[in-house]
Amino acid sequence: MVEVMMTLFAIVIVGWVAGKLGYMGGDFDKKLSSLVINITCPALILASAMTGELPDRRLILPLLGISALTYILLTGVAFLLPRFLTRKKEDEGVVGFALMFGNVGFMGYPVVASIFGQQAVFYAAVLNVVNTFAVFTIGTILIEGDLGDKRHFQKKVLYSTPMLSAYMAMLIVALGIDGIPGVISQPLTMIGNITVPAALLIIGSSMSQLSTRMMLGNLTVYTTTIFRLMLIPVGFYFLCNAMGFDSYVVNINTVVIAMPVATYGTILCLKYNRDTTFITEVTLITTLLSMVTIPLLTILFTL
């Protein structure tokens, strides 16, 4: 596991160097990000349901159940805990967002694939259906801080390319559709394999654009990081096991929860004219430290 994370971290470093040397950054990163989100990542999700042994359809409902439970409880955490982590009232919503949402779609799939194998990407995609819905409803409320505005949820999120690929993958597994021709599955697999290195290169390139001060963070950033990367995932791991969920489902859910802060936080802060300093810092710090904390968390799976 440590070797896997070191491999991923090495690709992040290559991205950082490429950003510093000018090979990456700016418009290139934006276009590559769009490619990953809208093409390679959906291909990875679909390929997870088309190659090798068909994923277990019996896990779909438990995955949706554990994900729904997770985000219901995390909603309470996001609205209650920030008041104890920051003295700035205006930052409570942003801190809550950082506590609640991990970078599932962009970093979660590559990490899950590296730890559990490509087939597990399908299970992570099922978990991400609830996560994506929550980001653009509860997440928007947290960032904007206005409970009275009914414009929070955008229906187009439900039929974005990543979500459509998740629906299709669930349909393939639920109906037991096997033996999909290689002329379809192999190109999807090859395109999907671009996701891991491309996503990590972009993360490294993004880090290369940040100042040293941002990389150091502050007390609120580090306390939020401890909850985001360690305390919350460990808490949910033991809670879900105690509730009798399948151990494989619990393990994948734990890794998904343990992802660094979702990049959507920065996007939403920009959209609603909120200060991006905290969300940028905590996204950076959690991304760096997750290279250490995720291998540590997987030790739980062997206990």
Question: Locations of the language-model features?
Answer:
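Alpha-helical transmembrane segments of multi-pass small-molecule/ion transporters
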Residues: 1-303
